[in-house]
C-alpha cells in the first residue's frame, strides 16, 4: 500500500499571511487619467498619506478623486491639496471634510528633491494614482510639466497612428 506524498507547500501562503486581498499587494483606489493628457510626467515618487479613519473607508469604497489635485511643499512638509475623498456613508457626525488638505509622508531628502523640481519654471507636482500597498494608502506623485494645446494634439495623433498600426498588423495576421 502506497502512502500519499506530502503536499507541495511552496505554492500555498504561510499560516500567518493576512487573508485580506487588499493588504496582500497593490490595488488602485483612484487613477488620475487627466494627468497624462494635460502634463508631461517626468519623475514619479511614492508617498504615504496621513488620513483619518473615515477617509480610509471611503477610499476603499472607491470615493477618491484626484482630478484637480496637486502637491505643494510648504515649510519643509509635503501636502496634497484639492484631492476629493467623498464622505463615508456609515459615519456619524464626525465625518471628514471631503477637500481637506492632507499631509504626504516622505523622507526629508525626497521633500528637498521635490521642492527643487517644483520650483523650476513650468513644473508642478501632480498625483497620478492613489493605491493600497500592504494595507496602507499611498499616492504616486509625479513631477510634471504642462502641455500646450499643440502638444496634446501631437500626442493624440501619435496614439491614433499607433492604434491604426496595431489594427493593421492584427488584420494581416488574421488573413
UniProtKB/Swiss-Prot annotation:
One of its GO terms (molecular function) is RNA binding. Transmembrane segments: none annotated. PROSITE patterns: SSRP (PS01317). It is found in: Cytoplasm. Residues 1-29, 152-175 are annotated as: Disordered. GO terms for cellular component: cytosol. InterPro entries: SmpB, SsrA-bd_prot, SsrA-bd_prot_CS. It comes from the Bacteria. Keywords: Cytoplasm, RNA-binding. SUPFAM superfamilies: Small protein B (SmpB) (SSF74982). GO terms for biological process: trans-translation. Required for rescue of stalled ribosomes mediated by trans-translation. Binds to transfer-messenger RNA (tmRNA), required for stable association of tmRNA with ribosomes. tmRNA and SmpB together mimic tRNA shape, replacing the anticodon stem-loop with SmpB. tmRNA is encoded by the ssrA gene; the 2 termini fold to resemble tRNA(Ala) and it encodes a 'tag peptide', a short internal open reading frame. During trans-translation Ala-aminoacylated tmRNA acts like a tRNA, entering the A-site of stalled ribosomes, displacing the stalled mRNA. NCBIfam families: PRK05422.1, smpB. HAMAP family: SmpB. Belongs to the SmpB family. This is SsrA-binding protein. It comes from Koribacter versatilis (strain Ellin345). The gene is smpB.
Amino acid at each position: 500500500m502506497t502512502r500519499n506524498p506530502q503536499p507541495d507547500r511552496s505554492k500555498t501562503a504561510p499560516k500567518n499571511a493576512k487573508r485580506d486581498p487588499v493588504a496582500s499587494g497593490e490595488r488602485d483606489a483612484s487613477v488620475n487619467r487627466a494627468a497624462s493628457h494635460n502634463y508631461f510626467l517626468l519623475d514619479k515618487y511614492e508617498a504615504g498619506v496621513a488620513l483619518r479613519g473615515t477617509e480610509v473607508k471611503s477610499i476603499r469604497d472607491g470615493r477618491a478623486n484626484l482630478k484637480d489635485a496637486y502637491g505643494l511643499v510648504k515649510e519643509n512638509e509635503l501636502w496634497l491639496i484639492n484631492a476629493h475623498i467623498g464622505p463615508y456613508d456609515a459615519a456619524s457626525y464626525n465625518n471628514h471634510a471631503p477637500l481637506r488638505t492632507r499631509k504626504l509622508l516622505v523622507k526629508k531628502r525626497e521633500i528637498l528633491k521635490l521642492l527643487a523640481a517644483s520650483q523650476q519654471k513650468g513644473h508642478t507636482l501632480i498625483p497620478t494614482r492613489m493605491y493600497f500597498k500592504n494595507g496602507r494608502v499611498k499616492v504616486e506623485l509625479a513631477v510634471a510639466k504642462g502641455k500646450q494645446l499643440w502638444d496634446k494634439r501631437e500626442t493624440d495623433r501619435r496614439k491614433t497612428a499607433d492604434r491604426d498600426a496595431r489594427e493593421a498588423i492584427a488584420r494581416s495576421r488574421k488573413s
